[in-house]
């Protein structure tokens, strides 16, 4: 799976 960090 592709897990991108979308906290920014």
From Swiss-Prot:
Top-rank taxon, per record: Eukaryota
Tissue: Tapetum of anthers.
Function as written in the Swiss-Prot or TrEMBL entry: May play a structural role in the elaioplast, a tapetum-specific plastidial lipid organelle.
Designated name of the protein: Plastidial lipid-associated protein
């Amino acid at each position: 799976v592709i897990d991108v960090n979308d906290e920014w």
